[in-house]
């Protein structure tokens, strides 16, 4: 499948547009203030003026948080409603980078700092120098495309050229401890046409898996450096690293057509979706090493599901869609977007989750903390703040992932109020998705030749309807004709609440059900249930009978659940030293009484008082 032609897409209303407005109004100004407070700018400034003070921060890769923010700003500062102070911040950082860059092109505020014990390129396993470069390149390409500002691109190319000279085909065979530069180098090739960057990206993909990083404090599997990429049997290791590496490999395939890469990517993707991805689209089940677990190892309350891993999964999904045209990749993209990604940001746009569990215990506040199950509620910033600026840049770019045009076909994959132009065809998309399942396309301008409009039918939409009548092929509803201004294409998706079961191998949720409506996963917070959430018993029938109600501009689900009696806490007491050798003989559990319960979209949980939460609820049994 070809890359496709250029298209112009703008969000004009609805939930995603509201998220972008919040990003401009609240999240970006908040991030700028936090970056200033944390010392990210001062770390660059002190390279020219050591009197500024010592290096600020614990990690050697903090420049990346500036780069990700700059990438988001490249999309925002040119808008009429640009965030306050955004342009001044953008210009200030670019000027600092110009001043800080070494004569040979190297740029890293930590390793250039004369007070640091490590020298450039001395710690590729943990120094993240190429990872930083990757985010610099992505910011530079965005600025060149969106702002016609080539200053960052000049900086990025100087650094990238140094890497090609040092680690190219005739250079030292190394890889970075954190994949990211691979997809950035491919994007730099697309922007400049310089094939050296594409060659370098392919080299980095091909070199991984040769044990280059085994000497570090983490095993090779953590870095995906234990097995060559094409031979990986399963997604493994650090979740963000894994998905970034796969996205980079997908980019290399897109430009080279390497079938061995695509075969590996499809195998790894299918394994991940079938056995290692949470219902929310979250990736990474272990707090230890922020890692992907074994097949079906998907604990709810200990889920790590890092917000950055959600973004990396969307990056991989988008590239797989572009490589194959298959709707299943956008199904996962959409699930991640509305759940595992969106939950990472508070409703007011100024606080963040790093990890995203599917359950919180009632007593969690007594033991909360990053080293013991993650944060209870979102935080304003982090010592390693990779997630907040990642959220910002992805939010700024959402319109670029609504559709793709190729071979006179407009593929509309993510639904939102928007206006899209491609191949002389302009359509206005009107919808209240994901709250409502009706998507209406009105043709505003059309060429005299035949065109095809393909609308994605999500896998959960078993009774979708399209008018005028078209064919449904491999997850797409397709209408082909010579369109004229005023023509309307309408897709209707079923939006009844659904009860989801779980694979029996997932011990952590066996015998439980979860609730979804459209692409949204729902959960119950303790403040919305008249009984302890751990004692609620839910049946599929109760889910199907749920009432949909608007609350604070979102749709919630009201339903009735039964309550276990005796409560689980009484039925299964904590075993003490006096009872360890005694068999537990308790009266049989029964269900008694019914209580009203309100389920809220998972992405909204944690915005109120810190109480218990569950996605997976115990199944009502026959008594």
Model-derived segments and spans:
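Solvent-exposed loop and edge beta-strand segments that line ligand/cofactor-binding
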Residues: 48-66, 82, 118-133, 165-178, ...
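Proline-centered turn/helix-capping motifs that create local helix->coil transitions or kinks
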Residues: 36-37, 99-109, 151-152, 193-197, ...
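Low-complexity, Ser/Thr/Pro/Gly-enriched N-terminal "stalk/linker" regions
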Residues: 1-65, 91-112
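Catalytic-core region of carbohydrate-active enzymes that cleave or remodel glycosidic bonds
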Residues: 254-275, 298-350, 361
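C-terminal beta-rich recognition modules with glycine/proline-rich loops and embedded aromatic residues
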Residues: 201, 265, 331-339, 344-442, ...
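Beta-strand-rich binding/interaction modules
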Residues: 448-468
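Extended ligand-binding groove/face enriched in aromatic
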Residues: 48-61, 77-176, 183-215, 223-225
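Well-ordered alpha-helical scaffold segments within catalytic/enzyme domains
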Residues: 16-18, 68-84, 134-148, 181-193, ...
């Amino acid at each position: 499948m070809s890359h496709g032609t250029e298209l112009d897409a703008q969000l004009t209303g609805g939930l995603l547009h509201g998220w972008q407005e919040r990003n401009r109004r609240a999240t970006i100004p908040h991030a700028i203030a936090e970056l200033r407070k944390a010392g990210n700018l001062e770390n660059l400034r002190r390279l020219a003026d050591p009197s500024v003070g010592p290096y600020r921060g614990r990690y050697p890769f903090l420049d990346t948080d500036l780069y990700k923010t700059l990438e988001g700003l490249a999309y925002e500062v040119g808008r009429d409603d640009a965030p306050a102070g955004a342009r001044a911040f953008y210009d200030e950082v670019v000027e600092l980078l110009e001043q800080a860059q070494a004569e040979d092109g190297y740029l890293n505020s930590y390793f250039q700092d004369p007070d640091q014990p490590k020298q450039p390129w001395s710690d590729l396993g943990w120094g993240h120098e190429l990872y930083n470069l990757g985010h610099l390149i992505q910011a530079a390409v965005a600025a060149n495309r969106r702002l016609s500002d080539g200053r960052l691109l000049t900086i990025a190319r100087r650094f990238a050229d140094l890497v090609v000279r040092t680690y190219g085909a005739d250079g030292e065979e190394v890889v970075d401890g954190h994949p990211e530069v691979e997809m950035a180098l491919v994007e730099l090739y697309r922007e400049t046409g310089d094939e050296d960057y594409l060659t370098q990206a392919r080299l980095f993909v091909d070199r991984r898996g040769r044990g280059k990083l085994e000497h570090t404090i983490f095993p090779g599997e953590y870095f995906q450096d234990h097995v060559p990429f094409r031979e990986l049997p399963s997604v493994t290791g650090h979740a963000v690293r894994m998905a970034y590496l796969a996205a980079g490999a997908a980019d290399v395939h897109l430009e080279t057509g390497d079938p061995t890469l695509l075969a590996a990517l499809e195998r790894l993707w299918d394994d991940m979706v079938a056995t290692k991805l949470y219902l929310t689209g979250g990736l990474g089940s272990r707090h230890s090493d922020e890692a992907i677990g074994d097949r079906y190892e998907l604990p709810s309350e200990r889920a790590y599901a890092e917000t950055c891993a959600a973004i990396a999964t969307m990056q991989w999904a988008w590239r797989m869609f572009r490589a194959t045209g298959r709707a299943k990749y956008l199904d996962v993209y959409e699930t991640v977007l509305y759940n595992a990604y969106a939950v990472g940001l508070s409703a007011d746009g100024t606080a963040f989750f790093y990890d995203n569990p599917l359950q919180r215990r009632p007593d969690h506040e007594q033991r909360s903390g990053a080293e013991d199950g993650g944060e209870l509620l979102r935080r304003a910033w982090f010592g390693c703040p990779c997630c907040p600026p990642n959220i910002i840049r992805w939010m700024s770019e959402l319109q670029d992932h609504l559709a793709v045009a190729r071979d006179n076909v407009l593929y509309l994959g993510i639904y939102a109020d928007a206006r899209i132009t491609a191949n002389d065809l302009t359509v206005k998309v009107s919808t209240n998705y994901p709250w409502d399942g009706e998507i209406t396309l009105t043709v505003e301008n059309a060429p005299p030749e035949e065109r095809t409009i393909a609308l994605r039918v999500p896998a959960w939409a078993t009774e979708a309807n399209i008018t005028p009548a078209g064919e449904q092929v491999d997850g797409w509803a397709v209408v082909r004709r010579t369109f004229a201004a005023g023509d309307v294409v309408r897709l209707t998706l079923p939006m009844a609440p659904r009860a989801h079961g779980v694979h029996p191998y997932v011990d952590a949720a066996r015998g439980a059900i979860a609730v979804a409506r459209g692409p949204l996963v729902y959960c119950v917070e303790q403040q919305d249930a008249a009984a302890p959430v751990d004692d609620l018993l839910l049946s599929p029938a109760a889910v199907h009978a749920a009432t949909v109600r608007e609350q604070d501009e979102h749709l919630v689900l009201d339903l009735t659940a039964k309550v276990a009696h005796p409560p689980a806490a009484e039925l299964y007491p904590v075993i003490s030293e006096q009872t360890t050798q005694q068999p537990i003989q308790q009266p049989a559990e029964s269900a008694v009484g019914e209580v009203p319960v309100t389920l809220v979209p998972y992405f909204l949980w944690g915005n109120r008082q810190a109480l218990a939460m569950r996605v997976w609820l115990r199944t009502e049994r026959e008594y």
